């Protein structure tokens, strides 16, 4: 874990591996308590961690059932009380007990620390009980720890109660930290005082090399307040305390002191504390990083004893390594002055200066861990990211960096390479990437055009960049080149610093070296080349010039596209504004801050500003997690590219921020097909980078800006087409010609990285239908830092739940082909083409499809050949041009690719022919069904013959687009699929016709008899219960289930009737009056990311009103009057009256259901526990419920209903609906509690005792 620096290497250097810790939801408090307590007592008994036998290092073992148990040797030691007595002899030899549990308990009682369980004090029998009672032994260990803490902290004043002991130790830590803060502030003031007459410094005076220590006044460390044990979780207070007593072992420069502290910062500090305790405390640190980070309540005593042991070491024993600093005597800690508070609290979240003190990836991407006195480069960020894909980040980081370096680039603040390394005692985390100002230096001179904002003022993006660039030259020696970087060693000029690459790069101008892909820190080979400056002099920044990065970043005339810098945290704000912009509007959502804060700004305003910055810091940490996740998905994009292999145009891409592979803008491949992907590397073995002028940089940015503008125009044109298609249906416009949306990918090459799956895969799932997505947000002023994120991928990524979009549920089937005439073409390095009528192929390189895309394929068929974005024909029946997926594999020869194209085109032609034949067959079916409808209508007495004919024509007409949508799906699986579809379609169409006809006939016929009794329709054969498990095994599920999980699947069967197959097809009986649940077919509510509640979607088919009818890319819900008889049958058999014991009652109720002519049945529950009481029928006219079986009120009015429920036949359970209105989607209900009599009737059939 820790490596010592070689002898003579200067300051102390440590190398940590970033730990992998358990998250809080996986952290077991009880297990952590047992592990920490056993580890402590073992170390205390054996006299230190190094003396514990190896077999007892880990007190737990895991059995074959993955259950943890205490090892038998540890159990034997605990049962014999030998372990406790040995621990007592080691810590308190003057009070040695006899080795027996009774003597130990008596001794602890005399010391005032009686171990107790929740029920009673620990007895001797509890300690001897077998199997071992771990709770009793942990109580004894806690009592031992308390007794030892009392003994070790006798010199601390106050009563000897546990809470008082805790408070005394915390007060000791807080007092030490406050005294260290005073000392640090005094030293900072002393260092800053010689720098006061900066403006009057004469250049003629003899000068020396400027050292980094002069910039210490820019920011100060933020020392934490310690009032509770939770304040120790950051590790800052403990590490600062160790530094106070052992400054030579732990330097203050190594401690991360900032506010707020991230988890990464806390882990870094806690590693320092763990390392010190393991090396210098007698019993080490038996607590894990999770224990110190989470500070759970069960480990309170363990933390107190650790503090007590530290106090004993520092204040009582005082070994040789304890050399306490000469701190001011301040037991009464002076409060922080108001001038320091904002800078300390804000320094961690608002300064644009990054400090490489923490071994974690930055929010924008991997950054280089530059540390160490020699300026050695420990690792390459690209290689570190590859290694980080394992179990932990294996980056090695050296510290302290006593020679801090400041370097910057012309990129935005969210770029991978915008790195500035600051003061030694400043913030140590890369999570402090805000746009706030640094702490202003009262006497430093700045450029007149760049005034320093006052404390607390949040500058704009451009001002923040100017602050960065204007602050850099103060660190340069007098007479050095503009872009030279220097690391000043504390040893002075006696040792020339090492250079990571040949020294001729040290004299290159700033614009020549900052605009290259790998950014390095160079060191002068000969310090005498630069003339020294006078003591305390800080050089003024040079004026903006063509070679200055400040001119590139802040000058509006840097290029003709007027680059605007925006932080990564501001991108989400642009999404809101982008919808209101059109054409080539540029989103400029920079933080709005006043020009200058008035001197009368209240303290309340300062506190609110601190809170806001803390919230922003939390938001940045979340964004860092997402950025790391995206980088992990784009593993193949981070390839190490040698700059010597790239020349000419490849260097222009380096100027644009070295966009990682897979995140290049979509338009980049058009104008510059020869650009290669490169990532920022800090490899020490690379050669010098050839110079390049500022003009090339501007030209490259202009080209990319023009490409992005062209893309945005295309996107705007497509958006306009979508808006026209969304016009009211009564006046639809003519269908536009098929417009091709070309998204060119990056040019491939030997070093080219594949596009990230996180960027390219969602684009393939875009539904062709128009959506309510905002106007495409491709900025006109495309700054280089923003080029990392392809704007088109954000526009193309759809929500997974199509059914939740309102516009996808309001269009008739005849509109669907017209609204989806726009095709999507994803090509590799292809310029935009004019719309053509020939079939368009979607070519996606296989390398760009990672595991997430591969997981979506449901079978082993050729990838994507069946998943087409195609609709067969418009409502008029004319075929449209074919469209499908074709995955381009760069490794396969062209002839094989041509064969695949030919096969795909052949399949598409077959689908068109099949659609044509199906339409002809459908016309014949229409005539046959009209005749059948007329014949059935004549059988009903006293009815007009024209009504059923007209009514029956409507459902037949709605089946036409459904048939066209089915054609592509049938060809995907061959003859078996086609035969199955045709057979089940015939069955389904006839059943639907009869159901809808019956819906028309029943209300009229019911007028001649009782409710629901008149006009009885022809009896159909009784069908069995709908078995969802059998449906899941059917070909419809196996062949369509995975297809429907894709948003763009348009060639599937109708969801509302897919389960009505003929009995001889699947061997499963199907209901004839109502379609079962189509939830097995992955309806949109079952898609990943769906947030709809059960009563808001139709996935469970608990009622006729919730069954959707699938008509291509749009899902809408069509209410019908089908019966829920079989849903109730399913509910009674599997939920309400399941099992043998309820079988007689269930059979009686099912017989009543079969006798009844009602359409809608409802179950009465006793209460919300869903206990079956009775079965009711719903009258559609009076909305009253009539009891059919069971016991309960004979009639139930809507006012008596308390709650209504809907049955989910897939999950076999009822779900309460947050409504009170009875409708066809209700399957069960409860009545108000006062309507139930206290005494239940003896049998369900008796109704005399039931409430009326």
Swiss-Prot record:
Residues bearing the modification Phosphoserine: 193, 334, 347, 351, 368, 373, 382, 548, 555, 561, 683, 767, 812, 881, 1077
Record's keyword terms, sorted: Cell junction, Cell projection, Cilium biogenesis/degradation, Coiled coil, Cytoplasm, Cytoskeleton, Microtubule, Phosphoprotein
Compartments reported by the entry: Cytoplasm, Cytoskeleton; Cell junction, Adherens junction; Cytoplasm; Cytoplasm, Cytoskeleton, Cilium axoneme
Coiled coil stretches, renumbered: 595-629, 696-727, 896-943
Domain Calponin-homology (CH): 203-312
Stretch list, region Disordered: 183-205, 331-385, 429-457, 479-604, 638-697, 712-935, 962-981, 996-1030, 1063-1114
Gene Ontology CC terms, in alphabetical order: axoneme; centrosome; ciliary basal body; cytoplasm; microtubule cytoskeleton; microtubule minus-end; motile cilium; zonula adherens
Residues found modified as Phosphothreonine: 184, 797
Residues annotated as domain CKK: 1112-1246
Biased composition (Polar residues): 335-353, 374-383, 441-450, 525-534, 812-825
Molecular function terms from GO: actin filament binding; calmodulin binding; microtubule minus-end binding; spectrin binding
Traits of the deletion mutant: Mice are viable but show growth defects. Disorganization of epithelial architecture, characterized by impaired apical-to-basal polarity of microtubules in epithelial cells. Defects in the stereotypic positioning of the nucleus and Golgi apparatus. Mice display subfertility in both sexes and severe nasal airway blockage leading to coughing, sneezing, hyposmia and rhinosinusitis. Majority of cilia lack the central microtubule pair in their axoneme and display disorientated basal bodies and defects in ciliary motion, which is no longer synchronized.
Tissue-specific expression: Expressed at the apical surface of respiratory epithelia, as well as in the acini of submucosal glands (at protein level). In cochlea, restricted to the organ of Corti and increases during development (at protein level). Highly expressed in both sensory hair cells and supporting cells.
Biased composition (Pro residues): 729-739
Biased composition (Low complexity): 359-373, 740-768
Biased composition (Basic and acidic residues): 569-580, 887-934
UniProt-listed Pfam families: CAMSAP_CC1, CAMSAP_CH, CAMSAP_CKK
One BP term from GO: in utero embryonic development
Major location category of this protein: cytoplasm
Primary role: Key microtubule-organizing protein that specifically binds the minus-end of non-centrosomal microtubules and regulates their dynamics and organization. Specifically recognizes growing microtubule minus-ends and autonomously decorates and stabilizes microtubule lattice formed by microtubule minus-end polymerization. Acts on free microtubule minus-ends that are not capped by microtubule-nucleating proteins or other factors and protects microtubule minus-ends from depolymerization. In addition, it also reduces the velocity of microtubule polymerization.
PANTHER family: CALMODULIN-REGULATED SPECTRIN-ASSOCIATED PROTEIN 3 (PTHR21595:SF2), PATRONIN (PTHR21595)
Domain commentary: The CKK domain binds microtubules and specifically recognizes the minus-end of microtubules.
Subunit structure: Interacts with PLEKHA7. Interacts with CAMSAP2. Interacts with KATNA1 and KATNB1; leading to regulate the length of CAMSAP3-decorated microtubule stretches. Interacts with AKAP9; regulating Golgi assembly in epithelial cells. Interacts with MACF1. Interacts with isoform C of CDH23; leading to inhibit CAMSAP3 ability to induce microtubule bundle formation. Interacts with AKNA.
Family: Belongs to the CAMSAP1 family.
Protein name, as recorded: Calmodulin-regulated spectrin-associated protein 3
Organism: Mus musculus (Mouse)
């Amino acid at each position: 874990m820790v490596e010592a620096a070689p002898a003579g290497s200067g300051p102390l250097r440590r190398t940590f591996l970033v730990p992998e810790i358990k998250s809080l939801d996986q952290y077991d408090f009880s297990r952590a308590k047992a592990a920490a307590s056993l580890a402590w007592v073992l170390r205390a008994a054996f006299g230190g961690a190094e003396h514990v036998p190896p077999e007892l290092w880990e007190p737990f073992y895991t059995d074959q059932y993955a259950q943890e148990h205490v090892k038998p040797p540890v159990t034997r030691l605990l049962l014999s009380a030998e372990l406790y007595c040995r621990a007592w002899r080691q810590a308190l030899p003057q009070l040695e007990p006899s080795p027996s549990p009774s003597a130990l308990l008596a001794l602890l009682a005399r010391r005032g620390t009686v171990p107790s369980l929740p029920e009673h004090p620990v007895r001797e029998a509890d300690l001897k009980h077998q199997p071992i009672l771990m709770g009793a032994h942990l109580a004894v260990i806690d009592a031992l720890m308390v007794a030892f803490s009392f003994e070790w902290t006798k010199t601390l004043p106050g009563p000897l109660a546990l809470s008082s002991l805790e408070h005394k130790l915390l007060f000791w830590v807080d007092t030490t930290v406050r005294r260290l803060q005073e000392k640090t502030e005094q030293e900072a003031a002393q260092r800053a005082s010689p720098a006061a007459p900066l403006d009057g410094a004469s250049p003629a005076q003899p000068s020396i090399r400027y050292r980094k220590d002069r910039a210490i006044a820019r920011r100060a460390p933020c020392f934490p307040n310690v009032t509770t044990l939770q304040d120790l979780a950051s590790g800052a207070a403990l590490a600062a305390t160790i530094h106070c007593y052992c400054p030579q072992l732990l330097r203050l420069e190594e401690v991360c002191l900032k506010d707020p502290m991230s988890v990464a910062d806390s882990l870094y500090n806690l590693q320092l504390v763990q390392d010190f305790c393991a090396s210098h405390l007698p019993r080490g640190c038996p607590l894990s990083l999770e224990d110190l980070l989470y500070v759970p309540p069960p480990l309170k005593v363990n933390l107190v004893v650790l503090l007590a042991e530290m106090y004993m070491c520092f204040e009582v024993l005082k070994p040789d390594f304890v050399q306490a600093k000469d701190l001011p005597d301040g037991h009464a800690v002076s409060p922080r002055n108001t001038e320091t508070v904002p800078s300390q609290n804000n320094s961690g979240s608002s300064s644009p200066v990054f400090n490489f003190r923490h071994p974690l990836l930055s929010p924008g991407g991997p950054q280089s861990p530059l540390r160490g006195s020699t300026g050695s480069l420990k690792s390459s960020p690209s290689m570190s990211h590859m290694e980080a894909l394992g179990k932990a980040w294996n980056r090695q980081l050296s510290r302290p960096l006593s020679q801090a370096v400041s370097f910057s680039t012309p990129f935005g603040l969210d770029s991978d390479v915008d790195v500035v390394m600051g003061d030694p005692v400043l913030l140590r985390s890369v999570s402090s990437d805000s746009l706030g100002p640094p702490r202003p230096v009262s006497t430093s001179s700045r450029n007149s055009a760049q005034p320093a904002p006052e404390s607390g003022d949040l500058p704009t993006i451009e001002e923040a960049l100017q602050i960065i660039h204007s602050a850099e030259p103060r660190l340069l020696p007098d007479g050095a080149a503009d872009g030279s970087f220097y690391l000043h060693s504390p040893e002075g000029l006696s040792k020339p610093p090492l250079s990571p690459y040949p020294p001729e790069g040290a004299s290159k101008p700033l614009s020549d070296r900052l605009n290259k892909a790998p950014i390095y820190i160079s060191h002068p080979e000969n310090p005498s080349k630069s003339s020294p400056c006078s003591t305390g002099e800080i050089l003024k920044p040079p004026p903006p010039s063509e070679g200055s990065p400040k001119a590139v970043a802040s000058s509006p005339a840097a290029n003709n596209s007027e680059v605007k810098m925006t932080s990564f945290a501001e991108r989400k704000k642009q999404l809101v504004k982008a919808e209101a912009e059109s054409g080539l509007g540029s989103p400029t959502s920079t933080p709005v801050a006043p020009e200058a804060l008035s001197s009368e700004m209240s303290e309340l305003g300062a506190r609110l500003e601190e809170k806001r910055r803390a919230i922003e810091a939390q938001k940045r940490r979340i964004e860092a997690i997402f950025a790391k996740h995206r980088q992990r998905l784009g593993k193949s994009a981070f390839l190490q590219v040698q700059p010597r292999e790239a020349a000419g145009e490849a260097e222009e891409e380096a100027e644009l921020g070295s966009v990682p592979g897979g995140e290049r803008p979509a338009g980049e491949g058009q104008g510059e097909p020869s650009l290669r992907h490169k990532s920022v590397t800090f490899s020490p073995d690379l050669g010098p980078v050839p110079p390049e002028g500022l003009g090339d940089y501007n030209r490259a940015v202009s080209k990319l800006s023009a490409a992005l503008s062209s893309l945005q125009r295309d996107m705007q044109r497509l958006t306009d087409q979508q808006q026209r298609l969304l016009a009211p249906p009564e006046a639809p416009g003519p269908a536009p010609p098929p417009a091709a949306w070309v998204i060119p990918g990056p040019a491939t090459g030997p070093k080219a990285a594949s596009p990230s799956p996180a960027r390219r895969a969602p684009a393939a799932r875009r539904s062709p239908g128009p959506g309510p997505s905002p106007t495409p947000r491709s900025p006109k002023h495309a700054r280089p830092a923003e080029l990392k994120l392809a704007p088109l991928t954000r526009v193309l990524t759809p929500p997974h739940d199509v059914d939740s979009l309102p516009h996808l549920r309001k269009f008739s089937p005849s509109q669907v082909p017209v609204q989806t005439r726009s095709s999507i073409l994803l090509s590799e390095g292809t310029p935009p083409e004019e719309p053509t009528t020939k079939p368009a192929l979607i070519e996606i390189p296989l390398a760009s499809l990672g595991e997430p895309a591969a997981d979506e394929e449901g079978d082993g068929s050729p990838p994507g050949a069946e998943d087409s974005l195609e609709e067969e024909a418009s409502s008029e029946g004319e075929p449209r041009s074919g469209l499908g997926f074709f995955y381009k594999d760069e490794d396969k020869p062209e002839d094989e690719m041509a064969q695949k194209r030919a096969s795909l085109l052949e399949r598409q032609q077959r689908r068109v022919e099949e659609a044509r034949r199906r339409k002809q067959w459908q016309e014949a079916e229409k005539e046959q069904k009209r005749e059948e409808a007329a014949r059935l209508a004549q059988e009903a007495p006293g009815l007009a013959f024209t009504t059923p004919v007209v009514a029956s024509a409507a459902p037949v007409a709605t089946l036409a687009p459904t048939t066209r949508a089915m054609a592509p799906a049938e060809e995907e699986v061959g003859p078996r699929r086609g035969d199955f579809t045709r057979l089940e379609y015939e069955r389904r169409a006839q059943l639907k016709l009869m159901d809808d006809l019956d819906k028309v006939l029943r209300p009229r016929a019911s007028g001649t008899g009782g409710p629901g009794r008149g006009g009885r329709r022809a009896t159909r054969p009784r069908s069995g219960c709908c078995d969802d498990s059998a449906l899941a095994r059917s070909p419809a599920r196996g062949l369509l289930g995975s297809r429907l999980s894709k948003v763009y699947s348009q060639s599937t069967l109708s969801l509302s009737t897919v389960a009505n197959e003929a009995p001889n097809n699947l061997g499963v009986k199907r209901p004839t009056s109502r379609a079962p649940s189509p939830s097995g077919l992955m309806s949109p509510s079952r898609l990943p990311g769906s947030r709809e509640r059960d009563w808001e979607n139709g996935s469970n088919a608990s009622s006729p009103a919730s069954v959707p009818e699938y008509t291509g890319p749009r899902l809408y819900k069509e209410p019908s009057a089908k019966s829920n008889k079989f849903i109730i049958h399913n509910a009674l058999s599997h939920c309400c009256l399941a099992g043998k014991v309820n079988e007689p009652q269930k059979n009686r109720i099912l017989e009543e259901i079969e006798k009844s002519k009602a359409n809608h049945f409802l179950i009465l529950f006793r209460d919300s526990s869903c206990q079956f009481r009775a079965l009711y029928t719903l009258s559609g006219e009076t909305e009253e419920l009539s009891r059919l079986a069971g016991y309960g009120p004979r009639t139930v009015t809507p006012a008596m209903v308390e709650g209504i429920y809907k049955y989910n036949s897939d999950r076999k359970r009822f779900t309460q609906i947050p409504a009170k209105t009875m409708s066809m989607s209700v399957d069960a209900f409860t009545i108000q509690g006062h309507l139930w009599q206290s005494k239940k009737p003896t049998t369900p059939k008796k109704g005399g005792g039931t409430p009326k």
